[in-house]
C-alpha cells in the first residue's frame, strides 16, 4: 500500500511535468518562428522567453477564476509579458551583451528593452495564447472546458 501511494504520486507529478514541458515547448517554438517570420531571424533565448511567457499566461487561470473578465486576464498577461521581456532583455542584452534586440529607437522605451508599441502588439498574441492554452489543456489533458466572460 505504501509503495502504491508513492507510485501514484510520482505518476501524477510526471503527468504534470510532461504537460508543462509540452506546453512550454509549444509556446517557445511558436514564438521563435513568429519572430523569424516578423524579423527574418531569431535567437535561441527567444525560445526560452516565449516558452516562459506562454507558460505563465497559460497558468493565469490558476490564479484567476473563469469569472474574471477576459480583458483583465489580457491586461495582466500584457504586464506579465512585459516583465518577462524586460528581465530577459536585461540579462541577454545588458548583462551578457548579446544584443538580441534594441527598442531604444522606439517611443516610450525602458532602457531599450521594452516599449509601448510592442506592449500593444503583444495584446492579440496574449489573447490567442490564453485561448489556445485553455483549449490545449481541455483537449489534450482533459482539464476543465474553457468559458470566458468578456465584461463583468
Residue spans of the language-model regions?
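Aromatic-rich, lipid-facing transmembrane alpha helices and their immediate juxtamembrane interface loops
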Residues: 2-152
Amino acid at each position: 500500500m505504501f509503495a502504491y501511494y508513492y507510485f501514484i504520486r510520482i505518476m501524477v507529478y510526471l503527468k504534470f511535468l510532461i504537460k508543462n514541458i509540452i506546453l512550454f515547448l509549444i509556446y517557445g517554438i511558436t514564438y521563435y518562428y513568429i519572430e523569424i517570420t516578423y524579423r527574418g531571424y531569431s535567437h535561441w533565448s527567444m525560445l526560452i522567453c516565449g516558452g516562459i511567457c506562454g507558460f505563465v499566461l497559460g497558468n493565469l487561470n490558476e490564479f484567476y477564476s473563469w469569472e474574471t473578465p477576459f480583458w483583465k486576464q489580457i491586461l495582466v498577461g500584457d504586464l506579465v509579458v512585459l516583465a518577462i521581456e524586460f528581465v530577459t532583455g536585461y540579462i541577454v542584452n545588458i548583462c551578457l551583451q548579446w544584443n538580441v534586440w534594441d527598442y531604444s529607437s522606439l517611443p516610450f522605451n525602458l532602457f531599450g528593452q521594452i516599449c509601448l508599441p510592442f506592449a500593444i502588439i503583444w495584446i492579440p498574441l496574449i489573447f490567442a495564447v490564453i485561448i489556445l492554452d485553455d483549449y490545449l489543456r481541455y483537449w489534450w489533458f482533459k482539464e476543465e472546458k474553457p468559458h470566458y466572460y468578456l465584461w463583468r
